[in-house]
From Swiss-Prot:
Entry EC number(s): 5.4.2.10
Post-translational modification: Activated by phosphorylation.
Descriptive protein name: Phosphoglucosamine mutase
Function: Catalyzes the conversion of glucosamine-6-phosphate to glucosamine-1-phosphate.
Cofactor binding note of this UniProt entry: Binds 1 Mg(2+) ion per subunit.
InterPro entries on file: A-D-PHexomutase_a/b/a-I, A-D-PHexomutase_a/b/a-I/II/III, A-D-PHexomutase_a/b/a-II, A-D-PHexomutase_a/b/a-III, A-D-PHexomutase_C, A-D-PHexomutase_C_sf, A-D-PHexomutase_CS, Alpha-D-phosphohexomutase_SF
């Protein structure tokens, strides 16, 4: 059996890979590991996105948590970053999110936050996994009044929205904003926050039915929002993913403004105000080379990590940085929240837009994006890490790097949640790098499928 936890909790096809039994075991073992040392009745928050499997998995997860004597506070459908924030705000011992983020609706996932609102380190996940593999035989089995119970926190969403609004001063009166909620967890929170901040808000994909989350919409399918922004002549558009821990923007001309550009815009704004910690932005190896060029020209430093917001966060915590994130729109403002937060990011970008008086296209122009092609090679889960040892693949990558002569790069990495190897090639000529990426994908699929 491979490791249960991936890069972002436990994830799989609901009722096939992520079963109610596994959800129960995760609730049971997770609650025990995260609250075993407490001297009081442990309190654990549980929230979810809009997937049809959420109710099934929530029932099982909560049963597991209650079976070891913990109290569950059910928050219903709510963004992932809200759980991270509210776990701290409500003095809970842990928080749990039922979501598969940007994945299709048939997938779901379970991830934990500790009492400080941080995702769990590998060592804690390993303890949870060990208990599950051992069948949970040694776990406490409280009876009578010591069995856990569930209650509801009716104003949780409002508390989160008020927190996000409180991170800025002023309002967004006069700014026309289009938002795509991906039929996901932001469908109430995002409109509520922006309406309250007096923006002129138009919303699409805010009618979840359990199966339409991320379906042709949201931050992984931007075309609908791009067209909508131009159609209604909005100043800016925002597309969230299914659990709203990431966001991408669209400028007034319908062009995508990605996570790298958002960090560049906000980073420069904070630097100019003298409040960007060490004048540094933490990004990943997948960030566009244009971010590095911009930083060099503007007196910023870019620190690079492995792909994954957990690694970005780790670097930020270790070295005291306040701004970091990924090209995909996972952006962390560590002086406000402990994880990527799509709504918080949208509000911070709107603040820059309002204060600068500039159009988003002008702000985004501070960074020239080098053409970048990302193609997924479909491989087996068992073989997706073997590209590191494959001489043919290694030789082809070396030849491509030589061909680019320092004006491009090749990056290969396995997906943490799916049977894929992601091939990213960056360079000056889009046609050439697209052709080379397709050639490399064919080789990888031929050797690792």
């Amino acid at each position: 059996m491979g490791r249960l936890f991936g890069t972002d909790g436990v994830r799989g096809v609901a009722n096939l890979e992520l079963t109610p039994k596994l959800a129960y075991q995760l609730g049971q073992a997770g609650a025990y590991v995260l609250t075993g040392e407490t001297k009081h009745t442990p309190k654990i928050l549980v929230g979810m996105d809009t997937r049809i499997s959420g109710d099934m998995l929530e029932a099982a997860l909560i049963s597991g948590i209650c079976s070891v004597g913990a109290q569950v506070v059910s928050l219903g459908v709510i963004p992932t970053p809200a759980i991270a924030y509210l776990t701290r705000q409500y003095d809970a011992d842990a928080g749990v999110v039922i979501s598969a983020s940007h994945n299709p609706f048939e997938y779901n996932g379970i991830k934990f936050f500790n009492s400080n609102g941080y995702k769990l380190p590998d060592a804690i996940e390993d303890k949870i996994e060990e208990i599950i593999q051992n069948g949970g035989e040694d776990l406490p089995k409280p009876v009578g009044q010591n069995i856990g119970f569930k209650c509801y926190q009716e104003n949780a969403l409002e508390d989160y929205v008020n927190f996000v609004k409180g991170t800025i001063t002023g309002d967004f009166e006069g700014i026309k904003v289009a938002i795509d909620c991906a039929n996901g967890a932001s469908f109430q929170a995002a409109p509520m926050a922006l309406f309250d901040l007096k923006a002129d808000v138009s919303v699409i994909n805010n009618e979840p039915d359990g199966t339409n989350i991320n379906s042709g919409c949201g931050s992984t399918h931007m075309r609908q929002l791009q067209a909508y922004v131009k159609e209604i002549k909005a100043d800016i558009g925002f597309a969230f993913d299914g659990d709203a821990d990431r966001v991408l923007a669209v400028d007034e001309n319908g062009n995508i403004v990605d996570g790298d550009q958002i960090m560049a815009i906000i980073g420069l704004y904070l630097k100019d105000k003298g409040i960007l910690s060490q004048n540094t932005i933490v990004a990943t190896v997948m960030s566009n080379m244009g971010l590095d060029i911009m930083a060099k020209n503007k007196g910023l430093t870019i620190e690079k990590t492995k792909v994954g917001d957990r690694y970005v966060l780790e670097e930020m915590l270790n070295k005291g940085y306040m701004l970091g994130g990924e090209q995909s729109g996972h952006i962390i403002f560590l002086d406000h929240n402990t994880t990527g937060d799509g709504l918080l990011t949208a509000v911070q970008l709107l603040k820059v837009l309002k204060d600068s008086g500039k159009k988003l296209s002008e702000l985004a122009g501070v960074m020239e994006i080098l053409p970048q092609v990302l193609i997924n090679a479909k491989v087996t889960n068992e073989k997706k890490y073997k590209y590191l040892d494959d001489e043919v693949i290694k030789k082809m990558c070396k030849e491509l790097e030589d061909e680019f002569k320092g004006e491009g790069r090749v990056l290969i990495r396995p997906s943490g949640t799916e049977p894929l190897v992601r091939v990213m090639i960056e360079g000056k000529d889009k046609d050439i790098i697209t052709r080379r990426a397709k050639e490399l994908v064919r080789v990888i699929e031929g050797r690792l499928s």
